[in-house]
Amino acid sequence: MVYISHPTEYGTLYTKQELADISSVCREYEIPLFLDGARLGYGLVAETDVTLKDIANYTDVFYIGGTKAGALCGEAVVFTGDSMPKHFLTRVKQHGALLAKGRLTGVQFDALFTDDLYLEIGKNAIETAAVLKEGLKEKGYTFYIDSPTNQQFVVLENRKMEELKKDVQFSFWEKADDTHTIVRFATSWATRMEDVEKLLSLL
């Protein structure tokens, strides 16, 4: 199996052509292509030429992330064409992955897929991330990666990072050098513009 994520852990996105090329190689060698869609709601509304239809066309299985889009739990697994393995539902049950009262997970996706809510709340993350990105640029911060998604990777002085820890939640990513660290700021469906403004004021 070939396993890819869209968006990736680094906040990057595949292009439609890249997805088509990977799919072509996988199909030539009869290797299933799996797309991790934990952040799919953010990837679909970021600046990209990849649509949900493209993902369905080029992959054998993907999942639509729920927890990163406001659901209490659950992801929606989608098998394309006739790619679902034999006895898949039985295997799910035998391996302890079938939730009792699983319809409660389904109800969340029913709500998320109504009136494009899934995409609308994804837009909030992208819009707030764009404001954060622009504000950081204006303050002279360096970016480790140019991400069009809700994940922004910023190089901070170690001293500034330690100060920021007192008031802000963010992810340590890796050391840039002895005096600088790369951190990740991630916006979400719930991020407010005032949250972004507060963060920028602390930087």
Name each region found by the language model.
Residues M1-G37:
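Active-site phosphate-binding strand-loop segment of PLP-dependent enzymes
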Residues L19-S23, A129, L200:
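Generic structural signal for well-ordered alpha-helices
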Residues A130-V131, G135-L203:
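Conserved C-terminal alpha-helix-loop-beta "cap" of PLP-dependent enzymes
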